[in-house]
Amino acid sequence: MLVPAPFLLVLLLLLGAPQVGLSQRSPKAGSSPSCLHTALREAEKSQRKDTSLLIKRTFPALPRGDPEDQEGQEEEDTEKRTFPGSVGGGGGGGAGSTRYKYPSQAQFQGRPSQDKAKSDRRTKVTLSLDVPTNIMNILFNIAKAKNLRAKAAANAHLMAQIGRKK
């Protein structure tokens, strides 16, 4: 769990600050809060900088500006995630493209012509959670291939030993 830096500084102030009593007077009592205030401002600046970098790198869909701009950004994000589909209905051609089903040409023949918005929806494929699954399948296939190569090498070694004994 990550705790914000200003919270940690305030906690440090409350728990670790020296107690000023009757017998204990600090000659620089006025400078200590100003130092802490400066440190707190620096921590807030660095935190804003870090969070803005995180937002830019890992969370492009988070709202950053005015509510009016969010609608345009959502449309741009949707356009970035969609790809024109192939004419044959296969989609992106990847391993998960069989999950996207399009109506056959026979179904289109009986219907009247549809407006452009509906036909555009059928020709675009939207990325979903299939992408990480496809990547995992590729990694599993690579691991299986390495395992098979290792077994084949071990079998070849055994066959060579058997051939020497005869």
From Swiss-Prot:
Propiece residue ranges: 24-123
Any one of the GO BP annotations: adenylate cyclase-activating G protein-coupled receptor signaling pathway
Residue intervals passing through the bilayer: none
GO cellular component: extracellular space
Biased amino acid composition, Gly residues: 86-96
Biased composition (Basic and acidic residues): 41-51, 113-123
Disordered, as annotated region: 41-123
SS bond partners: none
Signal peptide residue numbers: 1-23
InterPro entries to which the protein is assigned, alphabetical: CRF, Urocortin_II/III
Acidic residues biased stretches: 68-77
GO molecular function: corticotropin-releasing hormone receptor 2 binding; corticotropin-releasing hormone receptor binding; hormone activity
PTM annotation (Isoleucine amide): residues: 162
Localization (cell): Secreted
Keywords, in A-Z order: Amidation, Hormone, Secreted, Signal
Family classification: Belongs to the sauvagine/corticotropin-releasing factor/urotensin I family.
Subunit-structure text: Binds with high affinity to CRF receptors 2-alpha and 2-beta.
Job of this protein: Suppresses food intake, delays gastric emptying and decreases heat-induced edema. Might represent an endogenous ligand for maintaining homeostasis after stress.
Protein name, UniProt field: Urocortin-3
Protein species of origin: Bos taurus
Gene label: UCN3
